[in-house]
Swiss-Prot record:
Stretch list, region Disordered: 84-110
Alphabetical list of SUPFAM superfamilies matching this protein: Ribosomal protein S16
Biological classification of the source: Bacteria, Pseudomonadati, Pseudomonadota, Alphaproteobacteria, Hyphomicrobiales
Keyword Ribosomal protein: yes
Protein name per its UniProtKB record: Small ribosomal subunit protein bS16
Gene: rpsP
Gene Ontology terms: biological process: translation
Amino acid sequence: MSVVIRLARAGTKKRPVYHVVVADSRFPRDGRFIERLGHFNPLLPKDSEARLKLDLDKVKAWVAKGAQPSDRVARFLDAAGVKKREARNNPEKAVPRKERKAAAEAAAKK
């Protein structure tokens, strides 16, 4: 059983609120879950304390048991100092394609 810590959408249309839950990875996103760990309201300002509420003791216990956080939850845990998130390295994304690079070099020579 692969256990993940992820966001489950709640709220109404165009007014999302997310529950931070522990669930089996095979369960639907908004379906069954094992335990609720907190909630996240993206509509509140970023500096608001009510934007994200987590029970850090429960989160630490689930991470110790091997639960894998989703990408967004990993960002939350990194900000809270619970689990370090490794920075992504994608150096090829910013490199221009060969044709554009050649065209830019030709334009620079003129």
